[in-house]
């Protein structure tokens, strides 16, 4: 067996040292004398040609060194990306990389039932459900156990099993083996734990289509009528600020109402998720729809400021969370491989709703001269569209509600949702901080754009048009973000988009004064400003284990919610009305600084993610090297594989080395992550 020592890092180190020696030799040469005599003395032509030749050879050598260095880096990155692509067909890897709240709920429910029964769960694959080679080994015939009848359960467990698994209790161990039924093991893949139908004991993978597209349309409607409608509040805010609608109200009051809806929408998400597990999905959404209708209708009759706080602030915020959170849990049950596409289509609702309700709100305000009929029409239209979504929404494998009869079961749901163990994981805290800064800047920019346009001398119609363009760009940008994240890496895409947003805030928004300039700004920013909303869930899935996903998701939502409450209040406090040239300059700078903070945090998260992935691959490489040493191969292919493993070992040892230089090297290492 021969070994290859020409790995890329050792070669590159030699090249860099060679370059350094050449540069040092140039720097250590005799200094040039600039005396009059030396200037006047003629230089022989042969010396000039020799000097030019030496300079050219040095430049050529440096150029070759850099070229070889870049080629070696490209080779290393391609090797890592190839290893990532090798797992792209593994259904279990796909699920873990796209893990969602609905998957976490099903996993929690299945494990809860399993612990209560204290019996092995039976699994069988349905027709058409296929796994890739890495996952299918768990379901092969060799994993089937013949002695399932040897398990001794209590009488209560037997009775519950007869109710849940009537088919499996009618067969002997040999009959179960013939059906392809296996016992549940602790190290089973996540896809088996999540998509096992508890009523039949069968593994049922999502169909990636069919009625799932109707469900996608339903989620689109809920996003259209909740966050999409709320995105048009910037038009209402501009109207309230420019008209004395509620005597005695300050700009901070209206700003606080704007922040209240976003604050409650994020803060209540974990509580709504627990409520849905207790009373059921449809009941929760119907309750939220009723609250929404009442909120807008009551807001249209308000005459005092506190009434507006209660209706358009508190009640609307609660209704948004009660409607959209349960709806988003249905979609993952219908899609797995096409989940990013389905999620992207459903997210179109936020941007589309902002366009429609933004333009409609401005039109109704100009026609009616007040917000009364505007709020009534919005409330009725939103509640009807949500009712349509509830009627058509269908869970593929519904998780039964636990009901109100068991306080202990309800407490267990809250305990699982608000587990404080996730705080001990620093990367979860980093995700929460990143999400807070990015969402803070997003809301500040969205709610301020309309008022900023009016301060620059534009009409209210132009201001609402800018808001509509911004939301329309979001409807295109958000689906593309999800697809780009799956192709190029979530952290990579997030860093690129956050960098662009930082540039747009400082280099485009501040100098933009005309309507045309603000149109282009709205298009550019709208295409990438929703990056936090799109990427927060998948980044959590990349960082935590499936069993820890639910409390981590809850923590990310409620951790940054209080800051969203005062988001627009801070924007108004930073406004300098005496500065006629640009009263929102300080708010714009603060918004850009928030994106800078988000960029720093996501860069730290990227380094951590790369370190985890490289550490895992380093361990796998070392294990394979041990296996190769223990075995004997004398073929060309074996020799080639040995060389590749040695190159990988050297690469991982270098990248995972200690020191600040290695830390930043991992941070900028251009692999898909």
Swiss-Prot record:
The keyword Calcium does not apply. Gene3D superfamilies: MFS general substrate transporter like domains (1.20.1250.20). The modification Phosphoserine is found at residues 57, 112, 172, 637. Residues 1-208, 277, 337-339, 394-426, 526-549, 606-673 are cytoplasmic. Glycans are attached at residues 230, 471, 492. One of its GO terms (molecular function) is transmembrane transporter activity. InterPro entries: MFS, MFS_trans_sf, Proton-linked_MCT. Pfam families: MFS_1 (PF07690). It comes from the Eukaryota. Its main location: endoplasmic reticulum. It is a multi-pass membrane protein. One of its GO terms (cellular component) is mitochondrion. Keywords: Endoplasmic reticulum, Glycoprotein, Membrane, Phosphoprotein, Symport, Transmembrane, Transmembrane helix, Transport. Residues 230-255, 299-315, 361-372, 448-504, 571-584 are lumenal. The chain crosses the membrane at residues 209-229, 256-276, 278-298, 316-336, 340-360, 373-393, 427-447, 505-525, 550-570, 585-605. It is found in: Endoplasmic reticulum membrane. Belongs to the major facilitator superfamily. Monocarboxylate porter (TC 2.A.1.13) family. This is Uncharacterized transporter ESBP6. It comes from Saccharomyces cerevisiae (strain ATCC 204508 / S288c). The lineage of its organism: Eukaryota, Fungi, Dikarya, Ascomycota, Saccharomycotina.
